[in-house]
């Protein structure tokens, strides 16, 4: 460490000052009972096990003293505290007894801890002085020491000569002048330390066998003063430092103060004896602002005693953890290896001090041998043509890493870390020259010796030496705008700088301090705020600084600092480290806080990239900001022994040494010369980083514009050679073996609109074939990314690609035979044309050349599927695709076919409909009618999604059949990168149209570039591991073949077997919830009802609730009621095999009552539903249910919480057509209300689900086949009519009125009056969607044999929908059914929302229940009648609007439909 024992006393004398030793803590009881224990000890057993330490003889040496050896505990020190502010007038309170009480409080807790090890320890003794009026503290301490010695000698319970004693000497340097950086230069009086040493000398002479804790409570006293805001006794004047005391200065001075005490005591005679020692025990708080005043427990007796015990358990020199309750540490225990109290000797403290210092650091220079160091022939006007020698001015913004804190400090000189060595700063320092000091400024001076702006020497940002290094130690992102303002003003006002003409390079690096403190305020230090603050600074530079190249260096990967902190073999002042960066170092491995830090760190980096990639700073030709990411993945440098290498750090182990500054400068310089997208993000700093030279072809500092050259890509592949022998197998095909590329498809492959300008909608008809992702060959990979341009990097003789523009018949198209608007049925003609062209063209050796043909089809089919669902069925789609592939398979040799998924129609809808101001929404029906004109949550949209799934499924089945794997020279590989598109979303939530042509449908060149990269990546990925997601905004580097895997991947060389679709064994669900416990006490309010609180389930309804036909009948008898499988009340089996509401609830409460089992009425439980029931039967069922509950001996009617589900209406609708004049809606609502009134009056503690009736006509439309015949025979007369009949239309209106009639029950006044009763309408059937199979037809597996009732699969889906509705707030419930199979669809209660939702706890309409007038019976028919009128008017308006849409004029772009 480098501190010399000879100067310890001198340092301590200078640091201590005049403060009177005293303690100020919060008043507490003087015994252990009633104490506020730290959170880690509350309600928990004593954590230490004394028995594990074994039974040993009492220690003969204080340096092997175990807690069990201690026989006596005592304390001295003047413990004065302010009284509790809540007890009245502070100045009138009697303070006479308080010092004794406080001391006894602390010592009692400490004695109780020790008593676990040494049960015979008597009550502690405190001698804290008896005077009320404060007087000289040193004199009082002498008196206390003498009284203590006399007391111990007279104590009959104590063997004074042979018993081990623990004596605590409390003192406080209340002036805290030692925290001023200038304290070492001020000759402060040293009386305080002299008297303390005198007291210790007295104790050493008089007291045998003693372990003395010298406890410094300076900060406790200060915090107590701040917390209570007043002192009764005169307090010493606070020390006003002559200069600003920064956080860094404070923690360094704290450490220095502590080390001075340690060094003094460790080298004193106290550590040389066997029966007496003194150990310094510091009490420093975390430096988090306002933490002290937030928690008075930081000054209570228990916390102080607990912290003192932990200090005794820590080796000297390793007492690094600050005092904290908010992030408390557990009580520490003696270990078997170190069962004793730590002294300086048994901590090997002096040995560590005297360890030979590392050799003095030699500053790293460099040599630059670049052939071209000349500036541009004329001063450039574009930042994208800027050579290093053109730079005239250099500046920097940031924090202490740029200010250079400690960069030139000698090893061990921790105090010198306060010095800012700006001349050594990596990004802007200019000390000496490049031969001795490597910095960016010194590198640039090799190109332009007249460079200005660099800093030299030492000093703060305001010193002349700093010049344009305006970084501020301790700076955070929020401070950057002020720094930027000052930098701009300095450049404008300095006569050496030609502000308008000089080219400037400014490096901005920030974020370390933000991450170090992020956990104290996640909102304040959020990634968004971080980048917003950077943006504000950059905005100033962008607005005011001409001719500037700004390096934005991303925040370093700070979590690796933990390696240095945790490695005890490497010396570091850990107290400083932890105080400077608590949020990185104080949390445990695998903690959620650490995971949050890593996430924030990554998001800081990602958000920085996004800020710049937005183009916000590329609006001028003379200004740009470039992200330099070399710090993003920096591993902790290691020594040859594998330990963290602290030679890369300043003596505080936090800031950079000159070696790190040198490596950072080299890495920054190299980053500046690397193209964007190809910049190095990972460095091993232990390896010296060579300085590269500008590329003679591209001699400029790299910007986004001059790197990408439009939409180019860098290919890092080194091995670009073809196979040694021309391959005969498609499974041994390398990229360089490909000689021909071709493509088939629709307008996406034809290239419509790829190069169109954003506002040029008519230009979308232009086919930019040369830019097409799979077949275009315009330019080169350096500026145009396409699959052919990638392949041309491997084989310059590649042919077949298209160039320029034109249709499929143009010469430029060559083998890109895609046709705009083409459908699957058109593929055959494209295949025929393609084969003929390949046979006729002399550039193609038809039989010998290896070919890659990419096929993408299906988008245009989906655009028209709704015009004829049979013509565009999945069966017809795959039939046409199969025929085309069969011809290629049969007639074209040496082919690898890429079969690419089509663009998901959902993405097209999101972009097109999400940007009505940018997209031609008026032309939706012309551009892609069956995709763009559908309503959200409509049956038509569900059918579109089913068709899309069916198309994809049929493609997979076709390829997976092995049909095209029968020849050695032919294979079809499905490339699935299009399966999941991650659509970029702008800050306003709208989809990003910058990836699309002006019609918002076709991809533009930006999109095509990503498609080409994704296709190439897929081609190199083995089957079974192919990427199925395309993130359009992600940086997608080009992957390369490897030596072990050099081939384009096929099923065979991937060792892949296509999976067989497994049969589904049951319709159970997986239970993934973690919040499953009941309330701590039985709730009295239905609005605080958790699922586990439910004791009883019940149900009312018809045959859908008795589960008629849920399973096939084994006889010709009438259908069976499978009550045990019923969605809302069945309890057969368990959730893993049968998904029902009771089986879900049984996961929360295994003792649930009331559910049905099996098929017999005797096991129906509280399922009172009956086949054929209508709404008029609900009151009778309600009475039946009430009687069953009252008569059940297992149910406590008054105390048990009950969940009742009512679902009725199907039979009412089925028979409506027999008497259409009846007031069905009015009567329906009245009957259900009567049933609910009965339940409300008779059942305490009840939660009632009222499920809206499904849309009957929608659910049963289009069943066809056997079901069509059964529908004509069943008792539901209304379903016998055709979909277009007036009767069926009238049924739909009545159906809507029934739903509307009961939809407001949740809000009715009479059901919100009781605290223990609620009615909640569950609307998942409001918009009923017919379940569809993979072919887009009605999925009959959801229905029973009679095609009317639900099968067990249908019951499972209803149970899931009901359960999920129950966990959704009123007003935000799902109003449509999603009948698709997944075992993981069940929602879970959360810690934030653990209750079943009612109107009140949904908080949507908090006052509605109180304000709504009571619903009168006479008002029901009126409401129903109004609802009917509204329904009729709404239907007419909707039809008119739809008719209006059909009359939109056609558009000429119809020919470019997908």
UniProtKB/Swiss-Prot annotation:
It is found in: Apical cell membrane. The active site is at 400, 514, 655. GO terms for biological process: diacylglycerol catabolic process; phosphatidylcholine acyl-chain remodeling; phosphatidylcholine catabolic process; phosphatidylethanolamine catabolic process; phosphatidylglycerol catabolic process; phospholipid metabolic process; positive regulation of acrosome reaction; retinoid metabolic process. Residues 39-1402 are annotated as: 4 X 308-326 AA approximate repeats. It is a single-pass type I membrane protein. Residues 22-1417 are extracellular. The keyword Thylakoid does not apply. Glycans are attached at residues 173, 240, 493, 529, 590, 690, 783, 797, 809, 1055, 1113, 1275, 1378. Its main location: membrane. Keywords: Cell membrane, Glycoprotein, Hydrolase, Lipid metabolism, Membrane, Phospholipid metabolism, Repeat, Signal, Transmembrane, Transmembrane helix. Its EC number is 3.1.1.5, 3.1.1.4, 3.1.1.3. Expressed in the epidermis (at protein level). One of its GO terms (molecular function) is phospholipase A2 activity. Residues 1403-1445 are annotated as: Necessary for membrane localization. The chain crosses the membrane at residues 1418-1438. Calcium-independent membrane-associated phospholipase that catalyzes complete diacylation of phospholipids by hydrolyzing both sn-1 and sn-2 fatty acyl chains attached to the glycerol backbone (phospholipase B activity). Has dual phospholipase and lysophospholipase activities toward diacylphospholipids. Preferentially cleaves sn-2 ester bonds over sn-1 bonds. Acts as a lipase toward glycerolipid substrates. Hydrolyzes fatty acyl chains of diacylglycerols with preference for the sn-2 position and of triacylglycerols with not positional selectivity. Belongs to the 'GDSL' lipolytic enzyme family. Phospholipase B1 subfamily. This is Phospholipase B1, membrane-associated. It comes from Homo sapiens.
């Amino acid at each position: 460490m480098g501190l010399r024992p000879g100067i310890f006393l001198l340092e301590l004398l200078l640091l201590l000052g005049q403060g009177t030793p005293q303690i100020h803590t919060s008043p507490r009881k003087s015994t252990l009972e009633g104490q506020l224990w730290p959170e880690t000890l509350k309600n928990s057993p004593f954590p230490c096990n004394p028995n594990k330490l074994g039974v040993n003889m009492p220690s003969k040496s204080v340096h092997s003293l175990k807690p069990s050896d201690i026989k006596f505990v005592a304390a001295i020190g003047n413990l004065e505290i302010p009284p509790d502010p809540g007890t009245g007038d502070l100045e009138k309170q009697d303070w006479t007894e308080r010092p004794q009480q406080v001391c006894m409080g602390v010592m009692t807790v400490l004695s109780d801890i020790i008593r676990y090890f040494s049960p015979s320890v008597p009550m502690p003794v405190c001698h804290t002085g008896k005077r009320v009026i404060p007087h000289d503290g040193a004199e009082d301490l002498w008196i206390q020491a003498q009284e203590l010695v006399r007391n111990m000698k007279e104590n009959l319970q104590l063997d004074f000569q042979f018993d081990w004693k623990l004596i605590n000497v409390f003192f406080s340097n209340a002036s805290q002048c030692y925290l001023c950086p200038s304290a070492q230069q001020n000759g402060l009086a040293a009386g305080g330390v002299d008297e303390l040493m005198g007291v210790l000398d007295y104790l050493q002479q008089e007291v045998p066998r003693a372990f003395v804790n010298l406890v410094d409570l300076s900060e406790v006293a200060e915090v107590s003063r701040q917390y209570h805001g007043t002192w009764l006794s005169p307090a010493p004047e606070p020390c006003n430092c002559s200069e600003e005391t920064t956080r860094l200065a404070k923690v360094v001075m704290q450490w220095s103060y502590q080390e001075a005490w340690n060094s003094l005591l460790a080298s004193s005679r106290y550590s040389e004896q066997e029966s007496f020692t003194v150990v310094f025990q510091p009490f420093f708080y975390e430096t988090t602002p306002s933490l002290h005043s937030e928690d008075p427990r930081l000054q209570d007796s228990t916390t102080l005693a607990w912290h003192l015990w932990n200090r005794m358990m820590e080796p000297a020199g390793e007492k690094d953890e600050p005092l904290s309750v908010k992030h408390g540490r557990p009580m520490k225990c003696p270990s078997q290896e170190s069962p004793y109290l730590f002294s300086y000797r048994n901590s090997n403290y002096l040995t560590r001090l005297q360890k030979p210092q590392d050799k003095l650091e030699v500053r790293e220079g460099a040599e630059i041998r670049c052939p071209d160091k000349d500036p541009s022939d004329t001063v450039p006007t574009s930042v994208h043509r800027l050579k290093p020698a053109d730079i005239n001015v250099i500046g920097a913004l940031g924090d202490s890493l740029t200010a250079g804190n400690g960069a030139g400090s000698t090893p061990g000189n921790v105090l010198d870390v306060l010095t800012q060595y700006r001349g050594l700063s990596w990004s802007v320092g200019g000390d000496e020259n490049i031969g001795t000091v490597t910095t960016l400024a010194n590198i640039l001076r090799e190109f332009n010796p007249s460079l200005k702006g660099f800093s030299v020497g030492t000093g703060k940002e305001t010193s002349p030496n700093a010049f344009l290094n305006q970084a501020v130690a301790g700076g955070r992102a929020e401070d950057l705008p002020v720094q930027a303002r000052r930098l701009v003003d300095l450049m404008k006002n300095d006569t050496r700088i030609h502000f308008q003409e000089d080219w400037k390079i400014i490096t901005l690096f920030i974020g370390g301090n933000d991450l170090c403190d992020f956990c104290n305020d996640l909102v304040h230090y959020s990634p968004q705020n971080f980048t917003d603050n950077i943006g504000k600074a950059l905005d100033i530079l962008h607005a005011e600084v001409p001719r500037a190249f700004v390096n934005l260096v991303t925040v370093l990967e700070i979590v690796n600092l933990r390696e240095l902190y945790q490695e005890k073999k490497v010396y570091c002042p850990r107290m400083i480290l932890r105080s400077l960066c608590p949020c990185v170092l104080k949390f445990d491995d695998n903690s959620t806080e650490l995971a949050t830090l890593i996430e924030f760190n990554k998001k800081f980096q990602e958000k920085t990239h996004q800020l710049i990639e937005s183009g916000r700073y590329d609006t001028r030709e003379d200004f740009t900001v470039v992200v330099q990411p070399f710090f993003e993945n920096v591993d902790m440098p290691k020594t040859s022994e594998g330990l963290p290498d602290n030679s890369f750090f300043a003596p505080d182990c936090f800031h950079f040494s000159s070696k790190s500054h040198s490596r950072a400068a080299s890495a920054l310089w190299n980053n500046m010369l690397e193209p964007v997208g190809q910049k190095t993000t990972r460095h091993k700093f232990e390896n010296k980083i060579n300085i590269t030279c500008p590329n003679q072809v591209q001699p400029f500092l790299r910007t986004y514009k001059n790197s990408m050259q439009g939409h180019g890509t860098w290919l890092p592949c080194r091995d670009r050679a073809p196979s040694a022998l021309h391959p005969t197998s498609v499974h041994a095909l390398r990229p360089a073996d490909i000689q021909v590329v071709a493509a088939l498809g629709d307008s996406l492959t034809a290239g419509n609109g790829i190069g169109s300008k954003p506002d040029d909608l008519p230009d979308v008809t232009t086919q930019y074939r040369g830019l097409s992702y799979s077949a275009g060959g315009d330019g080169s990979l350096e500026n145009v990314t396409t699959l052919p341009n990638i392949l041309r990097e491997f084989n310059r003789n590649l042919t077949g690609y298209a160039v320029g523009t034109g249709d499929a018949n143009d010469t430029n198209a060559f083998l890109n035979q895609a046709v705009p608007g083409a459908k699957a049925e058109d593929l055959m003609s494209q295949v025929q044309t393609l084969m003929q062209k390949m046979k006729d063209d002399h550039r193609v050796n038809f039989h010998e050349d290896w070919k890659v043909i990419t096929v993408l089809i299906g988008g245009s089919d989906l655009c028209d599927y709704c015009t004829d669902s049979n013509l565009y069925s999945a069966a017809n789609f795959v039939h046409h695709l199969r025929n085309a592939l069969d011809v290629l398979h049969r007639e074209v040799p040496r082919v690898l076919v890429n079969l690419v998924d089509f663009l998901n129609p959902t993405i097209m809808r999101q972009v097109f409909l999400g940007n009505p101001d940018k997209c031609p929404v008026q032309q939706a029906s012309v551009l892609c009618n069956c995709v763009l004109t559908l309503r959200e949550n409509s049956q038509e949209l569900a059918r579109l999604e089913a068709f899309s799934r069916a198309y994809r499924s049929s493609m997979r089945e076709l390829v997976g059949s092995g049909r095209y794997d029968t020849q050695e020279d032919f294979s079809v590989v499905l490339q699935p990168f299009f399966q999941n598109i991650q659509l970029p979303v702008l800050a306003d939530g709208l989809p990003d149209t910058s990836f699309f042509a002006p019609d918002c449908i076709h991809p533009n060149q930006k999109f095509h570039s990503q498609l080409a990269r994704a296709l190439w990546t897929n081609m190199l990925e083995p089957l079974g591991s192919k990427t199925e997601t395309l993130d359009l905004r992600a940086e997608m580097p080009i992957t390369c073949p490897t030596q072990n895997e050099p081939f384009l991947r096929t099923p065979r060389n991937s060792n892949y077997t296509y999976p067989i679709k497994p049969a589904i064994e049951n319709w159970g669900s997986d239970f993934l919830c973690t919040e499953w416990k009941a309330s701590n006490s039985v709730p009295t309010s239905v609005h605080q009802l958790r699922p586990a609180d439910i004791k009883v389930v019940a149900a009312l309804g018809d045959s859908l609730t008795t589960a008629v036909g849920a399973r096939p009948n084994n006889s010709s008898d009438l259908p069976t009621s499978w009550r045990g499988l019923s969605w809302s009340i069945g309890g057969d089996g368990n959730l893993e095999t049968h998904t029902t509401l009771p089986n879900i609830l049984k996961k929360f409460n295994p003792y649930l009552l009331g559910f049905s089992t099996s098929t017999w009425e005797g096991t129906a439980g509280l399922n009172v539903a009956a086949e054929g029931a209508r709404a008029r039967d609900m009151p009778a069922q309600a009475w039946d249910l009430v009687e069953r509950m009252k008569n059940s001996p297992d149910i406590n009617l008054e105390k048990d919480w009950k969940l009742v589900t009512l679902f009725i209406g199907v039979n009412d609708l089925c028979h409506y057509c027999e008497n259409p004049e009846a007031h069905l809606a009015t009567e329906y609502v009245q009957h259900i209300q009567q049933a609910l009134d009965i339940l409300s009056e008779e059942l305490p503690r009840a939660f009632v689900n009222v499920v809206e009736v499904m849309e009957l006509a929608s659910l049963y439309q289009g069943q066809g086949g056997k079901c069509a015949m059964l529908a004509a025979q069943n008792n539901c007369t209304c379903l016998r009519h055709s979909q277009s009949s007036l009767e069926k239309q009238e049924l739909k209106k009545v159906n809507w009125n029934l739903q509307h009639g009961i939809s407001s029950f949740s809000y009715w006044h009479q059901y919100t009056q009781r605290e223990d009763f609620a009615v909640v309408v569950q609307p998942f059937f409001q918009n009923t969607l017919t379940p569809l199979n993979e072919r887009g037809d009605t999925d009959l597996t959801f229905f029973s044999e009679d095609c009317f009732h639900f099968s067990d699969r249908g019951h499972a889906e209803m149970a899931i929908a009901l359960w999920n509705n129950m966990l959704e707030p009123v007003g935000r419930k799902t109003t449509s059914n999603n009948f698709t199979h997944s075992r993981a669809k069940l929602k879970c209660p959360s810690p934030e929302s653990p209750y079943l939702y009612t109107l009140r706890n949904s908080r949507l309409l908090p006052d509605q229940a109180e304000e709504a007038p009571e619903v009168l019976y006479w008002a029901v028919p009126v409401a129903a009648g109004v609802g009917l009128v509204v329904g009729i008017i709404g239907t007419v308006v909707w039809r008119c609007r739809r008719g209006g849409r059909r009359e939109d004029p056609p558009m000429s772009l119809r020919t470019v439909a997908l």
